[in-house]
Amino acid sequence: MGMFCNQCEQAAKGVGCEIMGVCGKNPEVAALQDLMLYGLKGLAIYADKARELGARDEAIDLFMIEGLFTTVTNVDFDPVSLAGKLRTCYDMKEKAKSLYETAYREKNGGHAPAIAAGPAAWVIASDLEGLVKQGLEHGINTHHTDADVRSAIEILIYGLKGMAAYADHAYILGKKDEEVFAFFHKAMAATADPAKGLMDFVGLSMECGKLNIKVMGMLNEGHVDHYGHPVPTKVPTGTRRNKGILVSGHDLRMLEELLKQTAGKGIDIYTHGEMLPAHGYPGLKQKYPHLYGNFGGAWQDQAKEFPLFPGAIIFNTNCIQRPADSYKDRLFSWGQVGWPGVKHISGWDFSEVINKALECPELADAPEKEILTGFGHNAVLGVADKVIEGVKAGAIKHFFLIGGCDGAKPGRNYYTELAEKVPQDCVILTLACGKYRFNKLEFGDIGGIPRLLDIGQCNDAYSALQIALALANAFNCGVNDLPLSMILSWYEQKAVVILLSLLHLGIRNIKIGPSLPAFVTPNVLNFLVENFNLGPITTVEADLKAALGQ
């Protein structure tokens, strides 16, 4: 069995990647990531059984999160790195097995029932070639023989991957939760249970969406505890004469540590992609004046943009792509990120990155326009009275949430055109890197409220939900009754879990694009349409008319 991967929006031919991943993933890496999922299922089976007996181990819990995060699109492409993580996965599975057996013996006496087959019985291969061979035996098409059940399993697993990314960020900020840890194990163990059926996995996916709201809330709390509530902030998109380091990814804690270590060294720090919202946090922007600006746009343009940045560049999460030789020697990875030949920084010492930046040429004085960020729920709800007054007076007719992941497909210019054609009496909320499709355009304001409100990163969907729930409360109605339309773009698994969170809340009439997930079968799609009226984007004109009830 060869490579097959369909987890992202760019799945080849709308079906799946079988020769080489559009993301850059080769068959070797795909096999190692498939084996990671298989190993994590084995770990989960034992950890779940141990938990039922009152035994748990935080190291096992944390590895489940890190292991899932590793397999998110555009995170780790390094076979050597993945092989090392697989060895840790096996060790953690065996540790969970011992934990279960000990807990069983202490409670019941005697030996625990042995599990002789499946992922719990996995024995790791001794070398990289053997690991790849094992991975090829456990691809996603082996998850279930029934296509619809397999589709439901994939939705759950991709939701778990997305939630794992957020849980990892939250953990780094000191936020963790026993219910969340337990669910990861329960859900992953369920994917290996042949007795589970379609509706079991639908239910688990809804539970995943529910818990993801909790995880996003934990991450929001971690950010606010460390850096304060975001405030509306103008961010330069040009450069100034100084040495520079460009930070791409999502992790604010890593950015903070880099800011500490570069203070007073004549180095400016620039954000890229999903790091842009960092400028809205007072504990970062106001505390560290060398956090200067945002360079470039969304992740898919890095091959064009990074050669133009003369300093050091570091990724702390996805989305890394194959680096060009023109900047590969200035590129670093951190956390779960990996690419063959790219220097990986373990821990919190960024001296290698700093030294590389000091060796590199200075950036030029090249001022460009400023863009606004920092409209988290605290900032928006701080002017809720104006917003409510604007709606009641008819000055604000409708809200559009236009955001999500960006990507390389030509059809994504739909979101630019949509934002441009939203009527002047409507407000646009945006988040994640999809905002780069239109965040340099001028939208003006309504009664002093900007028509474009950048809420933040993809995980700040939590803020968007708080805004929607507060408005619903103010107007004494449900979220579905608000003059609010959600037209979302997706690319990877964090978008999947955010969608699950929205569906858990019963939010209907969401449109997603530019294409529907390849892993959703027609029958599963029909279920989503019938129960949630979830649908694909069509044309800008038709979707606007539908949203505005015209």
Curated annotation (Swiss-Prot):
Name the residues that span the membrane.
none
List, alphabetically, the InterPro entries matched.
HCP/CODH (IPR004137), Hydroxylam_reduct (IPR010048), Prismane-like_a/b-sand (IPR016099), Prismane-like_sf (IPR011254), Prismane_a-bundle (IPR016100)
Supply the Gene3D superfamilies for this chain: 1.20.1270.20, 3.40.50.2030
Q: Which residues bind hybrid [4Fe-2O-2S] cluster?
A: 250, 274, 319, 405, 433, 458, 492, 494
Q: Which residues carry this modification: Cysteine persulfide?
A: 405
UniProt signal peptide: none
**Residues annotated to bind [4Fe-4S] cluster:** 5, 8, 17, 23
Pfam families noted in UniProt = Prismane (PF03063)
Catalytic class of the enzyme? oxidoreductase
| UniProtKB keywords | 4Fe-4S, Cytoplasm, Iron, Iron-sulfur, Metal-binding, Oxidoreductase
Cofactor(s) in the UniProt record:
[4Fe-4S] cluster; hybrid [4Fe-2O-2S] cluster
Reactions catalysed, as given in the entry: A + NH4(+) + H2O = hydroxylamine + AH2 + H(+)
Share an example GO biological-process annotation for this protein: response to hydrogen peroxide
Listed disulfide bonds for this chain? none
Q: Which GO terms describe its molecular function?
A: 4 iron, 4 sulfur cluster binding; hydroxylamine reductase activity; metal ion binding; peroxidase activity
What SUPFAM superfamilies does this protein map onto? Prismane protein-like (SSF56821)
- Explain the purpose of this protein: Catalyzes the reduction of hydroxylamine to form NH(3) and H(2)O.
PANTHER family, per database record: HYDROXYLAMINE REDUCTASE
The family note in this entry says:
Belongs to the HCP family.
Q: What is this protein called?
A: Hydroxylamine reductase
Which organism is the protein's source? Geobacter sulfurreducens (strain ATCC 51573 / DSM 12127 / PCA)
